[in-house]
Amino acid sequence: MGLEWSSPGERQPLLYPGGPRAPRVFGRRWLVLLLFSLLAFLQGLVWNSWGPIQNSARTAYNFSGLDIALLVLWGPIGFLPCFLFMWLMDNRGLRVTVLLTALLMVLGAGLRCVPVQDLAVRRKLIHGGQLLNGFAGPTVMNAAPFLSTTWFSPDERATATAIASMLSYLGGACAFLVGPLVVPAPNSTSGLLLYSGSVGAIRDRIEAVMYAEFGIIFVVFAAILAYFPSRPPVPPSVAAASRRLSYRTSILRLLSNVRFLLIVLAYAIPLGFYAGWSGVLDLILTPVHVTQVDAGWVGFWSIVGGCVVGIAVGRFADSIRGVLKPILLLLFSGAALSSTWFTLTFLSNVTHLPLTTATLYTSCILIGVFLSGTVPIFFEMFVETVYPIPEGITCGVVTFLSNLFMGVLLLFLTLYQTNLSWLNWCLTGSCFLSLLFIACFRESYDRLYLDVFVSV
């Protein structure tokens, strides 16, 4: 009877037949992790290039508010072919997928550097370059759990996932720092601007940043081309050596799994809104007279704090297994309170909360620490919940939905740019909604059970 309700792939034994092969880890796993993390870092850096310097970009290239929002929107739009990259990772492995991703980033960064005098054409080239960089997003955001399972032992997986997934966010954070510090604001009265001319100096600095990013991306692409194997000679764990479901079966199983959909919404809504919110943080803080440089520092430290906490929490999860849900509840409680504080600060006339640089810094940094810190824990929980569905497919569906919510938020931003306080309310509401979803979620650790209780 049961055979009628299962596919041929699901009736295959989970473990491959044959003699025992003791799991083993290789030192080269750290090189693979380093190259992938560098690629993820650069993709995040390029994606967030324009939001932190939106005032300078308007002056240098005559970008409109719609252009700035669209430059950020190319990130989630780039996730439209996400399912193609998921199929490629599942069928061709890490090397082919990561190489294609790096090539798209090289082409995108190069397109932004084409020296054209016509500003209308230059704007189109920059938009095209951002779109190509957006197409690299599915791999750098999805592949971290797949890479950690393929190369790392069970007591290192959460740490490897945290490092690989957090570096993309760290790249976005460094854009908050690099852009405002290198590119002068249009209202600057520095000697450089007085000597070189405001518009020309700003444009030269922006182009210098784009040339530097292109050069670094090309070097990383060359390194990946030289050495980036899909898998180690011997699997590092029982889970890495086990069979997985087919692509079609995996998609159907994911979409029919209510527990998975519940925890996916708990991730996709707040993290998607947070990505869109942080991408236009400069616009949000402009009405309260926060300068471009100060907004950059706020964005930088909020994401850096989240990256540090995410990696630390990942290491903690490796040390004490089976506590992913309590960690998420703790982090989202902090995120909900911090986002509420930030939102109410903008209503100081009603709430009488002090609106100062210190309160903005503190509340923004806490939001980033708590929300970004949940990413690697979520990824590990997704994989544990739906195992033996491949990690790349699982996280592909998750990040596609996250970018869908980010795209919806930014789409509304292109339509309504007068008062951006509604963005703060969206972020706060999404944190409380996610907290409810996590509290209702029933956790399981199927992959961990296989590694702990089954020996090859």
UniProtKB/Swiss-Prot annotation:
Q: State which residues carry a glycan (glycosylated).
A: 62, 187, 349, 419
GO BP annotation list: pyridoxine transport
**Membrane topology classification:** Multi-pass membrane protein
Ranges of the Lumenal topological domain? 51-67, 117-131, 184-207, 281-292, 348-362, 414-420
Transmembrane regions listed in the UniProt entry: 30-50, 68-88, 96-116, 132-152, 163-183, 208-228, 260-280, 293-313, 327-347, 363-383, 393-413, 421-441
Q: What is its main location?
A: membrane
Q: Identify the Gene3D superfamilies for this entry.
A: MFS general substrate transporter like domains
The compartments listed are:
Lysosome membrane
Decide whether keyword Transport is in the record: yes
What molecular functions are annotated in GO for this chain? transmembrane transporter activity
What the entry lists under Pfam families is as follows:
MFS_1
A single GO cellular-component term on record: lysosomal membrane
Q: What SUPFAM superfamilies does UniProt report for this protein, alphabetically?
A: MFS general substrate transporter (SSF103473)
Q: Keywords in UniProt for this one?
A: Glycoprotein, Lysosome, Membrane, Transmembrane, Transmembrane helix, Transport
Q: Which superkingdom?
A: Eukaryota
Q: Which residues lie on this side of the membrane: Cytoplasmic?
A: 1-29, 89-95, 153-162, 229-259, 314-326, 384-392, 442-456
Q: What does this protein do?
A: Mediates H(+)-dependent pyridoxine transport.
- State the similarity comment: Belongs to the major facilitator superfamily.
User: What is the protein name given in its UniProt record?
Assistant: Solute carrier family 49 member 4 homolog
